[in-house]
Amino acid sequence: MNSKIEDMSNFFDLRAKSYDTHMKKNVDNFNVFYKRVSKPIIKTNKKVNILDLGCGTGLELKNIFKKCPNAQIDCLDLSKEMLEVLKEKYKDRQSQIKTITASYLDYSFKEQKYDYILSVMSFHHILHKTKLNLYISIFKALNPDGLYIEGEYVVNQTKESRLYKEYLKVKEEKNIEIDGTFHIDIPFSIKTQKQLFDETGFKTFQLHYHENEAAVYSVKK
């Protein structure tokens, strides 16, 4: 693990314009992966309310609008530059998209209930307890029978343990709290993810895609 770590918002602000190209090169079967993110969403012309956490430049929105052309989507990200790229890409959908510049670790989920909440390649920078608390907030923000969808960087349990130990080493060396505030990878295994969802109270775990270290799964409230 690279001991040089960067503040999360600065990291993504600096890379906003090149982010899409980077993801296309680094996500296994990029097009298939992002198409699978929208797979659990039911096709409808009705208005559905969706919250996209750590939305970045909105790579997942294209396929979502194909299935739900009248969706209202709240797009939350701590990088203002990422959101600017998103708004330019989807300027013809500006009446359907609300951008929120904030960290999902500090965001209040109390204002609205959602039919779907999703996160894509965003939650692998936070630890078990922090992620559990975030899942609890997500659970509460969903409508009855609402669905949470996650497309994520996943690893086997051996690599999960190794990267966690490396994280602890960096934390000790830097003598700072870096959980969720700095760009450092702490990915989990699918087994750990299932345990977290069980602890939260989610049900009906479904694995929609798993290729190398990229996976898409969903759970129901």
Where are these regions (language model features)?
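Conserved class I S-adenosyl-L-methionine
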Residues: 1-44, 63
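Helix-to-beta-strand junctions that scaffold the AdoMet/dcAdoMet cofactor pocket
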Residues: 126-128, 142-143
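A short glycine-rich, Lys/Arg-flanked "PGG" loop and its adjoining helix->strand segment in the class I
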Residues: 133-144
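C-terminal alpha-helical "lid/dimerization" subdomain adjacent to the S-adenosyl-L-methionine
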Residues: 151-200, 206-207
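Core SAM-dependent methyltransferase catalytic element
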Residues: 200-221
